[in-house]
């Protein structure tokens, strides 16, 4: 699949979607994107900057949601212009799709909305690539239906049907907890869409702090290594210069100063994993 100016897939090196959970300021966005561009450029990892203008599903009404669509899109446009990287953000309503698609390179759908047929179809008809997150409540094989909805919508609009990614971000495991089943990454390949692993939301503890979500960032490297060793097209990770002060999802954000070391390990694993193909394809 062609994404931005590079190809993605199991026969290609993994690409990275990374950035702060929510846009906190223009300077932080530009600085973070610049640091990530420098790191990924040195490692040869294709990179897309991600940050949200609105967190529409926060745990409580008191939680910081973001700077709003108008200001958020202005900042993302500046990141794209000044840093020279493609940008991605999530949308939550059909009315947001057109203005957001006019600015960003890639759209992302929230996990909670993966079953909303009209929403998925509208995103698919935007003309932009879409990273579709699997709901925490959804079986991995059910993502085929979601991807098929997107493909059918694209076909109806006369658009390419190969512009969609399937993103794993963990499955609900009792109350306030998620678990990652690495088999899901192989199962989701059967959708025919490139598979992305969200390593930071997979260690989230939803609502675990009462009025906000908790997280276990120490397990991000563990799950990221496992996912890359399983074989994925891309990795999604949220990062922050100072996670303790982050306005959203700080407990599961990777400290920006640790990204180079983590990505270096993932790059080596990815090369090794994809060098000789996938044995599971021979187990029939």
Swiss-Prot record:
List the cysteine pairs that form cystine. none
Which keywords fit this entry according to its UniProt record?
Cytoplasm, Lipopolysaccharide biosynthesis, Transferase
In Gene Ontology terms, what is a biological process of this protein?
Answer: keto-3-deoxy-D-manno-octulosonic acid biosynthetic process
Q: Does the keyword Isomerase apply?
A: no
Subcellular localization, per the record? Cytoplasm
- Sample GO molecular function, one term: 3-deoxy-8-phosphooctulonate synthase activity
- The EC number of this protein is 2.5.1.55
The record's top EC class is transferase
Give me the reactions it catalyses.
D-arabinose 5-phosphate + phosphoenolpyruvate + H2O = 3-deoxy-alpha-D-manno-2-octulosonate-8-phosphate + phosphate
Q: Is Cytoplasm set as a keyword in this record?
A: yes
Q: Which family does it belong to?
A: Belongs to the KdsA family.
The record ties this protein, via PANTHER family, to: PHOSPHO-2-DEHYDRO-3-DEOXYHEPTONATE ALDOLASE (PTHR21057)
What's the protein here called? 2-dehydro-3-deoxyphosphooctonate aldolase
């Amino acid at each position: 699949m062609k994404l931005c100016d590079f190809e993605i897939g199991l026969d290609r090196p993994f690409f990275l979607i990374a950035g702060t959970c929510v846009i906190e300021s223009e300077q932080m966005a530009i600085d973070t994107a610049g640091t990530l561009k420098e790191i990924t450029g040195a490692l040869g990892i294709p990179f897309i900057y991600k940050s949200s203008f609105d967190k529409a599903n926060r745990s409580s009404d008191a939680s910081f949601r973001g700077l709003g669509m108008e200001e958020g899109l202005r900042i993302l446009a500046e990141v794209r212009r000044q840093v020279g990287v493609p940008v991605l953000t999530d949308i939550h309503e059909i009315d947001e799709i057109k203005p957001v698609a006019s600015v960003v390179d890639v759209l992302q759908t929230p996990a909670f909305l993966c079953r909303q047929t009209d929403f998925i179809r509208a995103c698919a008809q935007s003309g932009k690539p879409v990273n579709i997150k699997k709901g925490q409540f959804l079986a991995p094989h059910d993502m085929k239906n979601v991807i098929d909805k997107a493909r059918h919508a694209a076909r109806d609009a006369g658009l390419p049907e190969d512009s969609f990614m399937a993103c794993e971000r963990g499955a609900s495991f009792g109350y306030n907890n998620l678990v990652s089943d690495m088999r899901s990454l192989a199962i989701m390949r059967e959708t025919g869409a490139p598979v992305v692993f969200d390593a930071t939301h997979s260690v989230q503890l939803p609502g675990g702090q009462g009025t906000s979500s908790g997280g276990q960032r120490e397990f991000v490297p563990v799950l990221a290594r496992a996912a890359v060793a399983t074989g994925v097209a891309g990795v999604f990770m949220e990062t922050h210069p100072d996670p303790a002060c982050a306005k959203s999802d700080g407990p599961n954000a990777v400290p920006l100063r640790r990204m180079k070391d983590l990505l270096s390990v993932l790059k080596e694993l990815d090369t090794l994993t994809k060098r000789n193909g996938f044995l599971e394809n021979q187990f029939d």
